[in-house]
Amino acid sequence: MRLARSRFRQWLLSPELLVIASLAFGVTLRAEEKPSIVATVIRAAKLFDPTSGRVLDSPVVLISGNHIEAVGSRDLVTPANARMIDLGGATLLPGFIDVHTHLTFDAGGGGYESLGISIPRAALTGAKNARLTLLAGFTSVRNVGAEGYADVALRDAIDAGDVIGPRMQVSGPPLGITGGHCDSNLLPPQFHYSAEGAADGVEAVMHKVREVVKYGADVIKFCASGGVFSKGDNPRLEQYSPAEMQALITESHRLGRKVATHAHSTVAIKDAVRAGVDSIEHGIFLDDEGIQLMKEHNTFLVPTSYPLFWFEEHAPQMHLPPWVRRKRPSLFPPPSRT
């Protein structure tokens, strides 16, 4: 199966060349930044070209405004008045793409602590994480889930040049069944609270798709199965019915949006693929039949492998709720770094 990243390039704007080493010197290229000079020339020891698999010695990169005009060797003709940046022995790399992020979340948070986080606070967390993500080498990301459309606001702030960060494709609130992984299940019934993306039934999910598109979603995210951090559900069980998935995905595609689904359950993965989902997120219990279906439907897997290592390292210091501690070992066994 092809890697997810190759196809998701069509979901995102083409990334600018990210000069990794230049960040240490305080040189940051950000999306849609208004240029103050006509041209910039960057020199370094090497440049990696992933298209050809070659490493170019003594590269010269010519940047005009926000666009890379040319990449060549020392004999590349450059404007006489261009700003010169010589990075010495550094190696230049293209910007990376992360297709599963939650920039407005605090990685160490969860459980009842999340109830105290306001939407403005989440947006500010997103501004912090967006900058760190760019400095880590990622020039484009797909953000698949944020309350209150905080990710939409963050995307727009980055595009306007008000916040430093990568280009973003965002989903807004993820869709899910009442009481499911994408709902908010921590408050007692007298509060009558449900997450923004909660929707049940064919007509309701179609309406919810239209709503999140109305408020700025570039991509649609829904939860096809239970998860780890959600209270009262089972990651091995399907949540949306096949009919609901079909309606949700069909309506999303009709409105020109790709669809990603959180799916651990073997059955949920297969039903989502048959319904035409574009990507499976996580896919913990994906089996051989599911893999074959994904190949037949040209569906991509986003395995999100890194959290396996992150949780193994940080779980002892986190105040994980009891239901997370019960679920985690079956979904996140101690990972092998081989």
Predicted feature residues:
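Divalent metal-dependent hydrolysis catalytic cores, especially in the metallo-beta-lactamase
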Residues: T125-D151, G165-P174, A217-S230, K258, ...
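Active-site mouth loops of central-metabolism enzymes
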Residues: Y112-L124, P188-H207, K258
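Active-site core of metal-dependent hydrolases
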Residues: T178, C223-S336
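Short, acidic/polar
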Residues: A122-A130, G201-E211, H264-A268
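Bacterial N-terminal signal peptides
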Residues: S14-G26
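Metal-associated gating/positioning segment near the N- to mid-region
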Residues: A90-D162, T178-H181, N185-P188, A243, ...
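Histidine-rich, glycine-flanked metal-binding segment
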Residues: E33-V38, L47, S52-L93
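N-terminal secretory signal peptides that target proteins for export/translocation
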Residues: M1-W11
